[in-house]
Amino acid sequence: MIPAGRAHLHVAAVTHPGQRGKSNEDRFAVSAHRLSRSDPTPSLLAIVADGVGGHRAGEVAAEMAVETISRLVAESDAAQPVRILSQALARTSQLIFEQSHRDLAQVGMGTTAACAWIIGDRLYSATAGDSRLYLLRNGALQRLTTDHTWVQEALDHGVLSPEQARDHPNAHVIRRYLGSKHPLHADLRLRLRQGESDAQAEANQGMRLLPGDRLLLCSDGLTDLVEDAEILAALSADNGSEEALNGLVNLANARGGHDNITILTLEMPPKPIQSRLRLSRRRVLSCLVGGAILLAVLLLAAGVSWILLRDGGLLGSTSTPQAQPTSLAPTTGTPIIPAEASATPLPPASPTPSVPASATLATAT
């Protein structure tokens, strides 16, 4: 793919270390591309990673995750997005595991990862761990991903109730993460409806995003302390701007802020990009055609006028009649002066809105 200078979705992101005085082991990245020189379809990849491991090793794992996944996706042809994402997470997990055995201080390090890849208006995702992906559409907030934790498995099997799960001592035991000694199988399910089978959820890959849809990726430092309904209220009131995200961070910190907090939102433009481009091109073409026709008419009129003026066809002349014996003075004819041609200025051509060209916007905080 070809790096682009701007993303085709509006991006907002915040990250905070929390209130416990620990270093920030969360990382996020956003990178924008076009598919190829012959195919200008825009692509945007967003990643949130939450590192785990002592001696700052979690930072290393999370940093490796966002950098390696971003690079592997950027080097792809985007022909099979689900396979590319799955392989990128698996390869990154292997590299983190290998790195952890080169340095004793990094043994056991790992990281979660939540990835959202939007190609045009199609969404593809892959996750591992308990970092989440949400969809805000038509005033409703839908969690698209499933946590890979001991507690979530207990909930799925009816061993715990939601109330019991909230404060359970195993609440943060992660069952799937990048950096494990076992090969990673990324979770490719996109859950749009209650009761969907795993196969149905995976079939939602490539779902079409609608104008105004918003995606939210976050680490568990937010969702451990802030309810989904509160996230919805904040985004609905403030359109997912940095101010709304900072408000959610402040709310989590006010309730203890026991972990790093990272939130990233992606918002689809109000109208489909391709439709706006086609409309703009039609307008520009109409202006150009209309201007060309008007210019041709003016040039033709000017040419005809010049010929007539040159030949005297429209000009009257001052006549000097032959003197007659009985004339006291010559008679002067009144010249006919043609009216000046008025030129109508050409309408200015409307500029064609540029589709942002995009260099990598990857951010690691």
Which residues are covered by each model-predicted region?
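PP2C/PPM-type serine/threonine phosphatase catalytic domain
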Residues: M1-A364
